[in-house]
Amino acid sequence: MIKGMEKGALKKLRKLLSPKKKADKEWYLSLLDGQAQRAYEEEHLKGVLSMLKVFYLSRYRRKIAVLKAEAEEIRRGENYTAADYRTLIEKNARIAAEEKAMGGYKCFFTEPYFARMDVTDEKEGYNSYYIGKKGDVNLEIVDWRAPLAVRYYQKSRVEFSINEYDYRTVLRRALAVKNGKLLDFKNEYLSVRDVLSEEEIAGRDEEILFDPYLRSIIQSRKDDVSIRDIIQTIQEKQFEVINRPERESFVLQGCAGSGKTMILLHRLSYLMYNNENLRPRDVLVITPSDSFNAFIDELSQVLELQKVRTVTLAEYYYAVLKNEGIDLKEKLCGERPDPAYLAYLYSERFPADLKKKVSSLYGDLYGLFAAAECREVTEKILSDCRRRQESYKRVKNASLRVRRAVLGEMKDKGEGYYFTKPFRALMSAFTQAEDFLGFVLNEPERTPDYFFRLFVEFYRAAKQIVSSAETVFTRAQEDLSALGETVRREIVDLKRYRRKQGEEEILTYADRIARREELLGEIGAVSEEIGRMKEGCDLFSELFSVVRMSGACAGLGRCADSVDVARWLYRETVQSYKRRYGMKGIYECDGYALCALLAEAGRRLTPRYGLVFVDEGQDVSKSEYDLLKKINGDAAFNVFGDLDQNVTPWRGLKSWETVCDKTYRLDRNYRNTNEIVGFVKKEVGADMTPIGLHGEEVVRLRLSGTTSFFRGGQGLKAVIAKEEYLPLFEKRGYCRPTSGGLSKTKINVLTVYESKGLEFTSVAVYDRGMTENEKYIAYTRALSRLAVVEGT
């Protein structure tokens, strides 16, 4: 039983937190009374915190106290043993686990909920629900991703159905709760006209269906060093995207500051919450940079997305290749590729050239065996291979001494077993040749990659056959001949032994002699069989000599495994393309090139995912999307981006139609102040609408005044410039981004591309040499303070 609380007080607490309300006229009148509602919300918050302490913290504290006492008793005990030590380790582990579990409820103290929604229905009556980042049954808090909480974001819908219940919304309220205090609340929607008269309402209801609290919440978080959590500020239009069906593929085109990345993460969290079968390993999130991954890490933890794989596109290519045994990342040369080559690589000409070349390689090789003028020879060789296998069966079924003469003995050499004679290995080579030729002549065509790998095995087997068949068969016949001589001598020796049977002298070992004479016949038959196996080897050698001298056959034939096949394909295609531009070595872009090559050859690449999210999707070329869809053939693709933010002349998209048929659009800027949005619209003609947040005017300043601009400012700071001008900002207090993320104390110095998707309280843009799109991106990284730096 709960200690320190009277039953009556506990009952009152549960009644307060219960969503079930007796909604009489007095209740509805109280909804219109601001002071009464503040008192109610404060009492409710107090009740939540009390219940939190009673049901959770007290329980954990008691457990921890007991465990600590037990641990202390063990420490103080006499004759401390190894068993006591193990028990103490277990106690400490349990203490740590209980403390961690107790820490999981910290979020309920910080911000237990952010909204309240009152609804009525004919079956359950009036219920008041509180919506939070995490749900809890005892605290009567509904998780924001739950079906009922979803309706909070659908501002224009006041009536809705869930399962068999038909609900009508009475109240939709935004709440600002922080560290156990109610800071403020605002009614987004309040409809009491069904119960109260116009005189009683007196204009105090709220029928306006938009989010009046959005501006104030964002404004209050504008200078927060940590990432802004906009769970409680999601607009209906945004949430329409968040709760699209799981298998729907779409593009979200949004202007700068419209919350595209937040929508991506919230959608993923929403889908995983509502589908228990959707596991983190089923989802891939492609982001623009490692700095961006670090930037969104805090929100990912809030939304419980830590286990979802978040990588750059280059890292995904590396992971795919690593699964193929190719560690490309370790071989990068560090040089910059020729822009002309990149323009070719990310254009549609590159995959077209790959397709043509791979098809040519495949066709040429396949034709050596299956073309009309070659087919008759191939069929004869295949027939010979099958005939040899029948003969080989007879050899294997021969008596022990004959088998050993031909096949040798099986011995153990530590790492495994081996045969003392090469006959079996030769016949295994003939089996591989037979399998390959049978596939080429009789089975449906498969992928080029499958054929290439089969060809490697055939080439290796054929090389062995050509180099050793004549010798092995001849040696086998010689060994059989030697065995025959031995058997004949044995017969002569056995015939020397005689005994009398009556008046007649008979052979003592007549049965042994008979068996050996039978063995001689078997030896002769097997020798003739091997002689027939030798027939046709010359024709096989002729075919192989033609194959060896044909085009790329020798190069492919030297391959040992699938990795070597990939290298051979690379040399025949990508490497030769790079030579045209005078490029040597391995570049980051080779990850895409090699993945595209292997996919074109038909190799089944992994890892594969069921859901693929792409942020800053305008920077990914059409051919890359085609590759991603080929690798992840069953995946739904959700692409988030802004066509106006594409800054790579050789990569990216001009239209979303090449990616997906369905496109949603957002044009309201939630990130920047009116002054910044107005400046950007004037400078680059951007199509976006501000939400009315006011801040400082945009300033222009000399290079020497950059440091002064940031002095005394709070929040994240950044200088954004073209790469060739970054050295201008190599000074004390400035820093380049690292793998650990952005600096919260120094001024971050970034290129335009590195800044994509990020946001800073104060930004100075050195826009010399920037394109319109680059300026658009750089200017809109500023939350509230923007300076344009001029001069040198």
Feature map (PLM): residue ranges:
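Post-Walker A alpha-helix
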Residues: 264-265
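Extended, charged low-complexity regulatory segments
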Residues: 1-243, 482
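Conserved lysine of the Walker
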Residues: 260-261
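Pre-Walker A (Motif I) flank of P-loop NTPase domains
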Residues: 246-250
